Amino acid sequence: ASAFGANANATGSTATAIGLATKAIAQSASAFGDSASASAWGATALGVGASAKADNSIAVGSAAVTEGRESTALGRRSYAGAQSATALGTGANASAIVSTAVGNGAKASAFQASALGNSAEASGESSMALGTESRASGSDALASGSNANASSMNAVAVGKDSNSSAVNAIALGTSSNVSAISAVVIGTQAKGTHENSVTLGSYSSSAANDFNQTAKTLSYFGDKSSVTVNYNGTSSTQKGAVSVGDGKLVRQIQNVGAGRITDKSTDAVNGSQLYQAYYNAGFNIQNNKTDTSRINTNGKVNFVNGKNTEVVVTDGDNAANITVNLKDDIEVTSVKANNLTVGPVTINKDGINAGDKKITHVSNGTISADSQDAV
């Protein structure tokens, strides 16, 4: 053992103490600096008041302290208090097994937790806080960025002032905020407040998961009647929503591939598919089996009165009733018929049967040898 300095003390085998009142009191222990102390096997203390109290631990810096085996404290008043803990920086504190604190005032207080950055804090098991004043308090949580906060299990917050406070939630972007289970937000000040939702884009937010299998009042182009539509593949299978804006801010989603169109499809469709559906949604009007007009979804069929007819259109349940009436008084150029009966009077190819009725107001007929006029 070797001791150099006033009141230096080296009592362990191969121990070394150098400095005023230094102590190396275990085998292979080394203490360097006034009042430095190495009190465990293979421990090293370097700096004024540094203290290495556990086997193979290293304390470097004024008042640095190690209390865990194979731990390391580097920096003024740094502290490594558990096995294999590492504290680097002024006031850095790693108090749990295999924890790491790097940065002035950084603190890692849970198993395998890592805090990297000035005043960063990791207090959840296997959590990681990266950035000045970042916080990771949930198990397996990740907070990256100045003042980022991940406070629940498996939560991820990346970006300055980002916040993730729900299980399995992810917030990516400056001041992004997610508070619902398994929700994801990406973008500056994006917000996610509904479970399993995905919010994309700066200032976007998610809406409530309100899924209804029946749309009760779906109408097209302002038609007077409405259509009830039933959807397959919805309701019970819905897990969340994807938002790219909020109530006031909207975005286009471009270059979308054509989705499958079936009775059970849940694919997104693009503008060209909607255009074709709209274009083909009308119908043709024929005249004696010949197309004469195309009526699109916002078109109209107009029924007009004729010379001797009158059209009446009445509203029905998602339908219209069309009645064509013959006027009481009609005007025709000629009538061709094999038989005509008016009351008791019958006119046909065999002659006129007056039905025992008078024929009045007969004009004077011509009286001649070949006349066929009535007289």
Regions found by a protein language model. Give the residues of each.
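Acidic glycine-/aspartate-rich tracts in secreted/extracellular proteins
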Residues: 203-210, 248-250, 257-261, 279-281, ...
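Extracellular receptor-binding modules and their adjoining Ser/Thr/Gly/Asp/Asn-rich linkers
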Residues: 240, 281-322
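Extracellular disulfide-bonded cysteine-rich modules/repeats
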Residues: 196-197, 240-243, 270-273, 305-315, ...
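Extracytoplasmic Gram-positive cell-surface binding/anchoring modules and repeats
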Residues: 262-268, 368-371
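C-terminal accessory segments
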Residues: 231-236, 246, 254-255
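Periodic small-residue-enriched repeat registers in elongated scaffold domains
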Residues: 1-228, 236-239
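Low-complexity, small-hydrophobic/phenylalanine-enriched stretches
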Residues: 242, 248, 253, 259, ...
